A protein has these predicted regions:
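A short glycine-rich, Lys/Arg-flanked "PGG" loop and its adjoining helix->strand segment in the class I
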Residues: 108-123
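A short His-aromatic
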Residues: 99-103
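Short, glycine-/aromatic-enriched active-site segment of Class I SAM-dependent methyltransferases
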Residues: 5, 124-146, 150-158
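Short conserved AdoMet
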Residues: 51, 70, 105, 119, ...
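A C-terminal cap/extension of S-adenosyl-L-methionine-dependent methyltransferases
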Residues: 174-251
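Conserved N-terminal segment of class I S-adenosyl-L-methionine
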Residues: 1-90, 94-98, 108-111, 213, ...
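Short aromatic-enriched loop/helix-cap "lid" or pocket-rim segments at secondary-structure transitions
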Residues: 70, 136-140, 177-181
């Protein structure tokens, strides 16, 4: 059975990838001996993009995307990252947790263990959904615990020892439309149909609302423009956040 997931073509994932790649190029070298850990890697879509910076190891709790990631040729283990991760201290040059920590009651535990795994000077790169008042049915179906403000994310990174290198909102241009749509749906009590609605139980797909081809193409273009803007400035508002923290060379 062929497995398909929306990361390959959905505007939200392609926009996030462009913004992340833009930011990572500012901090990460491209070296064969550069080791990255992608925590909560899903089916490995971002491993493909992270691999341009070095060698990538993935961890994922759900066996379905683990199977898919391995079929794609990625080095992924099934593991619950809320537990101490099975690597020695100072093992990695960078750790990514991309839309991961919002699923966990104890988000600080993941950040703290990621800090342990990083070499001195290593980078922690995070994406999370932004602003609790934007809570929607997508948050419920994806088992989110919270959404964050920039100040909250900075505080959690600092609390676990990281030096803040960059924090920016993402999806700035679509923010007014997204906020209006969420509020209108909330008032109407409407629950949008999600992409995985018709999947067989052994298939895997990230829970994301589908978009028509014209809308998907337009929003993908908006994401390209926004990635160019993120190269220059931190955006003041958006539906998501991207953060980069660095483990100090000495403590």
């Amino acid at each position: 059975m062929e497995h398909k997931i929306p990361e390959d073509s959905h505007w939200w994932f392609s926009s996030r990838t462009r913004a992340l790649t833009t930011i990572m190029k500012q901090f990460l070298p491209k070296r064969a001996d550069f080791h990255l850990l992608d925590v909560g890697c899903g089916a490995g879509n971002m491993i493909h993009h992270l691999s341009r910076f070095g060698r990538v190891k993935g961890l994922e709790i759900d066996p379905r995307p683990v199977k898919m990631a391995r079929q794609r040729g990625y080095d992924v283990d099934q593991f619950d990252a809320t537990q101490p991760m099975p690597f020695p201290d100072n093992s990695f040059d960078a750790v990514t947790a991309l839309d991961v920590i919002e699923h966990n009651q104890d988000d600080l535990a993941i950040l703290s263990d990621s800090y342990r795994l990083l070499k001195p000077g290593g980078y922690m790169i995070i994406t999370v959904p932004a602003l609790m008042w934007l809570w929607s049915h997508n948050d419920d179906i994806n088992a989110h615990v919270r959404r964050y403000t920039a100040a909250e994310l900075k505080q959690k990174l600092a609390q676990t020892g990281f030096v803040i290198r960059r924090v920016t909102y993402n999806n700035f241009f679509i923010f007014p439309l997204a906020a209006a749509l969420i509020l209108l749906r909330r008032l109407a009590g409407e629950k949008p149909q999600l992409a995985s609605h018709h999947l067989h139980e052994d298939e895997y797909q990230v829970e994301m609302e589908p978009a028509s081809p014209p809308v998907n193409a337009l929003l993908t273009l908006v994401g390209k423009v926004e990635a160019g803007l993120i190269r220059l400035i931190n955006l003041p508002i958006g539906t998501s956040l991207i953060a980069v923290g660095q483990k100090p060379l000495q403590r």
